[in-house]
Curated annotation (Swiss-Prot):
Pfam families: RNA_binding
Entry protein name: UPF0201 protein Tneu_0685
Family: Belongs to the UPF0201 family.
Originating organism: Pyrobaculum neutrophilum (strain DSM 2338 / JCM 9278 / NBRC 100436 / V24Sta)
InterPro entries for this protein: PAB1135-like, Ribosomal_uL5_dom_sf
Matches recorded under Gene3D superfamilies: 3.30.1440.10
Organism classification: Archaea, Thermoproteota, Thermoprotei, Thermoproteales, Thermoproteaceae
HAMAP family: UPF0201 (MF_01112)
Length: 143
């Protein structure tokens, strides 16, 4: 599994705080800086399920597996890619809030692109289905 997270750092924002928001929900192996029209982009990447463990833990801690699964399912692109966004300001305080509409996150979201051989296993691992508030199948981490 390969994961890339892209987050915009606007001119009015502190890069260290944006990086903290990213690292509260993601454990990157590499972070690159790229110029953009409204500031800079931080492009973080890694391989393996471990880099999404913070995001998974937050989803489970908040008890939002079903809501997360719904958003993630809508972000499936093709047979091997899932694209989704989380609110940068919420991530800064360690909370996961999915962004579903353009402009919903005023300072821009953190956008994740996950490439995996098994999208269903990824969904079952990150945000499994629940029944009456309890997870009834916990998949092993994907490739």
């Amino acid at each position: 599994m390969k994961v890339e997270a892209v987050v915009e750092v606007r001119y009015t924002e502190d890069k260290a705080k944006v990086l903290k928001a990213l690292e509260n929900v993601f454990t990157p192996k590499r972070v690159e800086e790229r110029e953009s029209d409204s500031g800079m982009l931080l492009v973080a990447s890694c391989e393996g399920a471990g880099c999404l463990e913070k995001l998974r833990s937050a989803i489970w801690r908040q008890g939002i597996q079903d809501a997360a699964r719904s958003v993630l399912s809508k972000g499936v692109v093709g047979e091997d890619t899932v694209v989704f966004s989380v609110n940068k300001q919420a991530a800064y305080v360690g909370v996961v809030s999915f962004v579903t509409e353009p402009g919903e996150s005023p300072l821009g979201p953190i956008t994740f692109t996950v490439k995996t051989n098994n999208v269903r296993q990824f969904l079952d691992w990150l945000a499994p289905r629940t029944y009456r508030g309890r997870v009834y199948y916990e998949a092993p981490p994907p490739d």
